[in-house]
């Protein structure tokens, strides 16, 4: 069974590609152009930051990149929700939101694990 790291890496790459394809299909207007630009930036940044985290040289660097990836995910959700009302293809946009939700849940699990480890380490240090 593939580990969570591999699954998240592959999921973020696939998600980025799907967002790119979705945006390429959209007819650009004065209204949706800035939203599409922001969506492309934030959606592809999730995977880029996760890739950096996965290759981090320290736990602190890993933690920082994971938190950045999660922030980019929150921004991506915002832009996808706006696009849902603007797109001529709401089914494709909803599919992206569904895929996104799985990525967000996995990132949240990583963040929770980091928080739990940090709390355990703090308790261990305090008990010395």
Question: How would you label these PLM feature ranges?
Answer:
Residues 1-128:
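Short, C-terminally biased terminal segments at protein or domain edges
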């Amino acid at each position: 069974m593939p580990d969570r790291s591999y699954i998240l890496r592959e999921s973020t790459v696939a998600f980025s590609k799907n967002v790119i394809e979705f945006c390429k299909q959209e007819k650009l207007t004065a209204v949706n152009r800035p939203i599409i630009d922001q969506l492309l930036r934030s959606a592809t940044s999730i995977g880029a930051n996760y890739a950096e985290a996965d290759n981090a040289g320290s736990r602190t660097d890993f933690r920082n990149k994971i938190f950045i990836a999660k922030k980019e995910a929150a921004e991506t959700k915002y832009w996808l929700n706006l696009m849902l009302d603007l797109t001529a293809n709401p089914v494709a946009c909803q599919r992206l939101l569904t895929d996104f939700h799985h990525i967000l849940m996995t990132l949240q699990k990583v963040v929770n694990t980091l928080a739990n480890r940090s709390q355990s380490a703090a308790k261990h240090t305090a008990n010395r």
